[in-house]
From Swiss-Prot:
Glycans are attached at residues 200, 222, 280, 304, 466. Pfam families: Lipase_3. Binds to both phosphatidylinositol (PI) and phosphatidylinositol 3,5-bisphosphate (PIP2). This is Putative lipase atg15. The active site is at 320 (charge relay system). It is an enzyme of class 3 (hydrolase). GO terms for cellular component: multivesicular body membrane; vacuolar lumen. Lipase which is essential for lysis of subvacuolar cytoplasm to vacuole targeted bodies and intravacuolar autophagic bodies. Involved in the lysis of intravacuolar multivesicular body (MVB) vesicles. The intravacuolar membrane disintegration by atg15 is critical to life span extension. The gene is atg15. Residues 1-20 are cytoplasmic. The chain crosses the membrane at residues 21-40. The keyword Ribonucleoprotein does not apply. Belongs to the AB hydrolase superfamily. Lipase family. Residues 577-599 are annotated as: Disordered.
Length: 630
């Protein structure tokens, strides 16, 4: 009997346990967090026993593989259209063209190759509250105070999140291809979504015009998105695509003083220089924070993208100028960043007043650790290495003032100069050449390390002001005006002189005459050799010598009646003599005349020699010398 009762009791307890278990499962909430403790049949408040518990799973894995596809293309207007912000959604039927580096060649895009990247744990020190409104408050205070806002350690956190695995070659290549893709929609098939601003933009405002472009990639689960910002247009001179606007932003962000104080070829984009190597830093910072500049446009673009994907993990990438803007966004909002051949951006990061963790100088953002930023590049690229600023560099001849030299975060450098013997040239800066000649050729990804002991604009002196000053640059021009001074009094001037009947002319002439007579008995080549020279102002008497002896010179006169080839063939010739008349020379203290007398030796020996030779010539040729003055 007792055994029968025990069996019935065991069956009842078993039935009660099964029904209790089923009831507990039915009463579970529909959504349960994986990190919360979930109990089957929770114990009563006074019970000392705990009910059965479901084993807890660990945190989500930070190591994963992502396959990305292009989802959107954003266009943010700057200079010409500052209110423009539009989005193009990529759909299966959307027809896109890929634009070449020079913007001239276009080809239809086919997305055959998947964009695959891996993620790994990444630690970033960033602000705990990263809402755009809070960040804007910090940036506004920095502009007003002239320096970054000082925050306490409680405002900062060390977050470990899923970031791009930059140790894998495939991941690096995928990000590089994202930066290389520059897409436009086939003309005539555009389907724009205007986010805000005016809706009556002209059709001439297109992809190759003013503005900042961003390509938005997302993985299959929309858990991770990548924002790729377009880099600098490769054309050197204004008028090709976004080249003019890119040059303005390049010279504003990466020059010591907006292109001032250097080469006359640099395009000057602000007026903040006070004197040689002295500039107003407040003026420069205000110009960089203008709403029509790339940094403000990049913040606006990022804010609208995160509104579409509020729970997604955001990664940034870009090439050249786009890489620098991506890095600035990463420092602002604490995002993982991978750039390629980026312009050194530590200089603008310091001037924008980005917040820095305690213990770090906000004026030296290159000293920060745990930024989550990786800059890939090679040693033959002068833009990446910060050396494209010499007098003979192509950057200077193109008007670019690329003076910054320091990167934030870590640099991952391919030493192509040492490994491949490349020479430093701007042609190696193009992203497609980097992909084909560097990233795909090297077997391994280079190690990444932070720059040490790097400083920008060491020759310059900067000062801050309250922002109310008006900064001007003085230019001195020299104008030459011809001046004519008339010394005559003329009421009716004419083409060939004054037409007045009488003209008054005032002229003063001073004349000084000195007459010196020297008597030298022993002349030399360089003066008189007499020990005493007598100077007398009285004219010397004239001495005349007459020679009565006639001089006879034979003169031959030939008459030929029968000339031949080699002379006259006549048998005889006649010779006549001519007697010259007497010749006299007169010598006076004023001058020597050769008119019928020869001096007696009072003249210089060279003078007597000359007169003797002159007499022989006269007698020989029968010349009639009237007057010679020596």
């Amino acid at each position: 009997m007792k055994s029968s009762q025990r069996r019935i009791k065991r069956h009842a307890m078993r039935d009660m346990s099964i029904s209790t278990l089923l009831l507990s499962v039915v009463l579970l909430p529909s959504v349960v967090s994986a990190n919360d403790h979930v109990y089957f049949n929770p114990p009563s408040p006074g019970s000392p026993f705990l009910g059965p518990q479901i084993p807890l799973t660990g945190p989500p894995s930070l190591t994963n593989e992502h396959e990305f596809t292009l989802r959107h293309i954003y266009e943010r207007g700057t200079n010409d259209q500052p209110d423009l912000h539009r989005r193009l959604d990529i759909k299966p039927h959307t027809r896109l063209w890929a634009v070449s580096d020079d913007g001239l060649e276009k080809e239809l895009v086919t997305f055959d190759t998947p964009l695959v990247a891996s993620s790994s744990p990444l630690t970033i020190q960033r602000l705990a509250d990263r809402r755009p409104s809070v960040i804007e408050g910090y940036l506004t205070a920095a502009r007003y105070n002239g320096e970054a806002v000082a925050l306490s350690s409680s405002d900062w956190v060390m977050d470990t999140l899923a970031g791009p695995d930059v140790t894998k070659k495939e991941t690096v290549l995928t990000f590089a291809k994202m930066t290389a893709n520059d897409y436009i929609e086939e003309p005539g098939t555009e389907d724009w979504n205007y986010i805000h601003g005016r809706f009556n933009y002209s059709s001439s405002f297109g992809w190759q015009s003013d503005g900042l472009r961003g390509h938005i990639y997302a993985d299959t689960k929309n858990n991770t998105i990548v924002i790729s910002l377009k880099g600098t247009s490769p054309a050197l001179f204004d008028g090709a695509g976004t080249t003019t606007n890119d040059k303005i932003n390049d010279n504003l962000f990466f020059s010591c003083c907006c292109g001032q104080g250097g080469s006359y070829l640099w395009r000057q984009v602000c007026d903040c220089q006070q004197s040689a190597f002295t500039a107003n830093l407040t003026c420069i910072a205000e110009a960089m924070n203008d709403e029509n500049k790339y940094y403000r446009a990049a913040i606006d673009l990022y804010t609208n993208v995160t509104d579409m994907y509020p729970d997604a993990n955001v990664w940034m990438t870009g090439h050249s100028l786009g890489g620098a803007m991506s890095s600035l966004l990463g420092l602002t909002f604490g995002l993982p960043v991978v750039t390629f051949e980026a312009v050194p951006e530590a200089l603008p990061a310091a001037r924008l007043g980005l917040p820095s963790p305690p213990g770090h100088d906000p004026r030296l953002p290159q000293t920060r650790k745990y930024t989550g930023t990786y800059h890939f590049g090679h040693t033959a690229d002068p833009v990446y290495m910060g050396t494209c600023n010499g007098v003979g560099s192509i950057c200077t001849w193109g008007g670019y003032a690329m003076e910054s030299a320091c990167h934030t975060g870590q640099m991952c450098v391919y030493d192509t100069v040492e490994d491949k013997g490349w020479r430093v040239a701007l042609s190696t800066h193009r992203i497609k050449a980097v992909i084909s000649d560097v990233l795909e050729v090297y077997d391994n990804v280079p190690p990444c390390a932070a720059e040490e002991e790097c400083y920008d604009c060491e020759l310059w002196k900067f000062f801050r002001s309250n922002g109310s000053e008006t900064t001007t640059t003085s230019r001195t021009s020299t104008t030459t005006t011809p001046t004519t001074t008339r010394t005559l009094t003329c009421e009716t001037p004419g083409w060939w002189g004054c037409l007045d009947e009488s003209t008054t002319t005032t002229a003063t002439t001073a004349t000084s005459t000195t007459t010196t007579t020297s008597t030298c008995k022993t002349p030399g080549w360089f003066g008189c050799k007499d020990s005493t020279t007598t100077v007398d102002a009285t004219a010397a008497p004239t001495v005349t010598t007459t020679i009565a002896t006639p001089t006879t010179f034979p003169i031959s006169s030939t008459t030929c009646k029968d000339p031949g080839w080699f002379g006259c063939r006549d048998p005889s010739s006649t010779t006549a003599s001519v007697t010259a008349p007497p010749f006299s020379t007169s010598t006076s203290s004023d001058h020597v005349r050769a008119d019928h007398s020869i001096g007696d030796g009072a003249a210089h020996p060279l003078t007597r020699m000359y007169l003797e030779r002159l007499r022989q010539v006269e007698f020989a040729w029968g010349s009639d010398i009237e007057h010679y003055e020596i």
